[in-house]
């Protein structure tokens, strides 16, 4: 999914009125937001953070200094590790690492949903939707997290719902 489409989904989930004008620059199609009253903003994380502040939902950026740093870390991870990776091998490495991280966590940063969860959900959707039942079981922690995030009101919107089975097929899928 193109970054502009993700930013429009984010706008809607934040309750902002549509109307921002997005474009993309360069070979990597880096998103650009043309603001009405200032310079244009460049980059997915920068624009998304701006939208969160514009919607007065700063809690999505983390509530403590550590959570804020973790949110930024995961936004960087989204841009450097998720975007641009399309090979099956890259995807499985990414999911394996994320699965380990989420082993004892409900959210990426802290005890509540953050912008990091939302943008990583949008970034991973294209991969998760194509996973087999066996692959979803292999990445059980990612599947649990993804299923949880997709059921938040206004997050999934028009994206296809990914079905996860409740009973495991294999006892030792790890």
UniProtKB/Swiss-Prot annotation:
Give the matching CDD domains. Answer: GST_C_AIMP3 (cd10305)
Principal place where this protein is found? cytoplasm
Q: Does the keyword Acetylation apply?
A: yes
Protein name, UniProt field: Eukaryotic translation elongation factor 1 epsilon-1
| Chain residue ranges for the region called Linker | 57-63
List, alphabetically, the SUPFAM superfamilies matched: GST C-terminal domain-like
Modified residue annotations for N6-acetyllysine:
138
Q: Which residues carry this modification: N-acetylalanine?
A: 2
Location in the cell reads:
Cytoplasm; Nucleus
Q: What is the recorded function of this protein according to its Swiss-Prot or TrEMBL entry? A: Positive modulator of ATM response to DNA damage.
Q: Where is this region: N-terminal?
A: 2-56
């Amino acid at each position: 999914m193109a970054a502009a489409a993700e930013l429009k989904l984010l706008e809607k989930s934040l309750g902002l009125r549509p109307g921002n004008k997005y474009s993309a620059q360069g070979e990597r199609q880096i998103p650009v937001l043309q603001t009405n009253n200032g310079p244009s903003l460049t980059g997915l994380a920068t624009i998304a953070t701006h939208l969160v502040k514009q919607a007065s939902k700063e809690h999505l950026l983390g509530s403590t200094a550590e959570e804020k740093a973790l949110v930024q870390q995961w936004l960087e991870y989204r841009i450097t590790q998720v975007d641009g990776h399309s090979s099956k091998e890259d995807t499985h490495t990414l999911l394996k690492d994320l699965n380990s991280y989420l082993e004892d966590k409900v959210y990426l940063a802290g005890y509540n949903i953050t912008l990091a969860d939302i943008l990583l959900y949008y970034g991973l959707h294209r991969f998760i939707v194509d996973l087999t039942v066996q692959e979803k079981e292999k990445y059980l922690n990612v599947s649990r997290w993804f299923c949880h995030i997709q059921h938040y009101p206004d997050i999934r919107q028009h994206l296809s719902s990914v079905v996860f089975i409740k009973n495991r097929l294999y006892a030792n899928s790890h």
